[in-house]
Amino acid sequence: MKNRDLFQQDLSLLVKSGLCSRKEYASGYARAVHALRQIKIRADRGELPFLRGPFLPLTDLSFVQENFKGMRMILVVGSPENIAGLRALSGIMQSWIWVDGARPRLCFLDDLDPEVFWELMSIANPMTTGVVVLSESGESEPILLQLMRCLEYWHGMIDKEDLAKHFVVVTSHTSSRLMRLVDRWKLPWWKYPPVAFPQLGCFSPPLLAPLGLAGFDRGRFNMGSGTLCVQFFQGQLKAPLEMAAVVFAGHKAQALDAHRMWGQGSIFHPITSWMQQVSARLNKHSPYRYFSNLEPMNSCTLTTLFFERHVARERLVPDFWKDVPALKTLAQTPMLHWVKEEHERLCQAQVKSGHFLRCINVHSLNEETLGALFMNHVLETLLIDTMYDDAHHDLH
């Protein structure tokens, strides 16, 4: 698998905008290459455990898969930090890729507000709803309370002998209050090692389990993220290095101080939200800040625009419109034509407004592409932060 088969990074509009000189870019690229070596050393020392996630064996779901087979909804109980990546992946899968309605719907219960719980219960049928509980320590009181709520509610709706078929617990510690609930109700469970950087939990095999139960192809996701990671450390992947070089050079030239993630259409919103959270988590040394497309921009903002370019789009039925000659040509034009035209219009509008623009053109959204996009952003963020850390040490 080549990165270019999944997505392409287009920096041409950044080059035309004069964000930085060739000399400044070359200096930034040299720093990025040095930062890559630093990251490799840290990874070899085990300091970046989430980078190993795509290469770990997938969690075996066979012992609960039969129970969850007929579920129409899967309720995920966990902390906001643990399930941020799952929210992003399920959001894009359910709103865009899983459109046939054949898979269970994933919902997330990470808010103690009673209104949130009862709103979910208003659409959840306990007979066809499974609950997956994610808790590393087994002692998180919000998670314990949510599970206790669910057990109380399900207990009144389902026969006691069938109750355990609707629950599965994922935890690291066997001597916890959560395990007392597991023993009391005889709930199925499995143990997983503690996960560092919970906001990168999408690279953790156990934390991908709820998506796997819903039909998400975890193997393809790991293939996309893992292959990209290998290409990066082997020096075959240039996209993160090029972007990091541009960012560092632009900031040094005082032309850049912020980065906005923006997806064309609402389908990319879950991805951009997750990317902002990851950047906030990993960005320890860089003054560079990330924000959403809802915040006002200034002239020193770089925008990353995501665009799916080769997806098959439906056409209108020309014969249906044959009695309206003025619309005949419009009806015969593939939707993809208008999507591309809108993309070009957005790009030109950004450039004319004096904003810096990078485009990431996705070939087609699927599990493999998502894995590559997620890993690319993580590596890019690590590079930028490491470059600023090195620069800080140079000054001192």
Where are these regions (language model features)?
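Cofactor-/ligand-binding subdomain signature composed of acidic, glycine-rich
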Residues: M1-R72, E380-H392
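A glycine-rich phosphate-binding loop feature that marks nucleotide/adenosyl-phosphate handling sites
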Residues: S225-V230, S292-P296, N361-N366, H396
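Acidic catalytic cores of enzymes that act on phosphate-bearing nucleotides/polynucleotides
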Residues: N3-D10, K40, D44-F55, T59, ...
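A generic structural motif
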Residues: S135-S140, A196, G212-F216, S266-I267, ...
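C-terminal helical/tail subdomains of lipid-metabolizing enzymes
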Residues: R358-H396
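Flexible loop/turn segments at secondary-structure boundaries
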Residues: N82-G85, P114-F117, E139-P142, S175-M179, ...
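Glycine-rich phosphate-binding loops that contact phosphosugars or nucleotide phosphates
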Residues: L61-Q234
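Short, solvent-exposed amphipathic alpha-helical segments in soluble enzyme
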Residues: G91-Q94, S122-A124, M148-R149, D183-W185, ...
